[in-house]
Design a protein with these regions (language model features):
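Short, basic-rich loop-to-helix N-cap that marks the start of a DNA-contacting helix
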Residues: 46-56
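Short C-terminal boundary/hinge segments that cap the last helix of small helical domains
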Residues: 51, 62-70
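Short basic helix-loop element that most often maps to the first helix and adjoining turn
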Residues: 12-30, 56, 61
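Conserved hydrophobic/aromatic packing and binding residues within compact polymer-binding modules
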Residues: 14, 28-29, 39-42, 68
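Recognition helix of helix-turn-helix/homeodomain-like DNA-binding domains
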Residues: 33-47
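A detector for short, charged/polar N-terminal pre-domain segments
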Residues: 1-9
Length: 70
C-alpha cells in the first residue's frame, strides 16, 4: 500500500487525540456522524482517509488539521 507509514501515523494521532479528549470510539463516531465501525477502521489504519473525513474528525475533536498531521 502506498503511504502506509503516513496512514498509520494519522490513524494513531486520531486515536491519541480521541483518548486525550476522554471520548469513546462511539462518542467520536457520533460527533462525526459516522458508524462506530468506520471510525474503528480509521483508527486501525485499515481504510484510506479523504481530506474531508480528516477535517470532519478534526472538527469533532476540536483540533486543527495540523494537530493530526504534525
Amino acid at each position: 500500500m502506498v503511504y502506509e507509514e503516513e496512514i498509520a501515523y494519522i490513524s494513531s494521532r486520531i486515536r491519541e487525540l480521541r483518548k486525550e479528549k476522554h471520548l469513546t470510539v462511539q462518542e467520536l463516531a457520533y460527533r462525526c456522524d459516522m458508524e462506530r465501525s468506520n471510525l474503528s477502521r480509521i483508527e486501525a489504519g485499515r481504510t484510506n482517509l479523504t481530506i474531508r473525513t480528516i477535517c470532519i474528525i478534526c472538527s469533532a475533536l476540536e483540533v486543527g488539521l495540523r494537530d493530526i498531521i504534525r
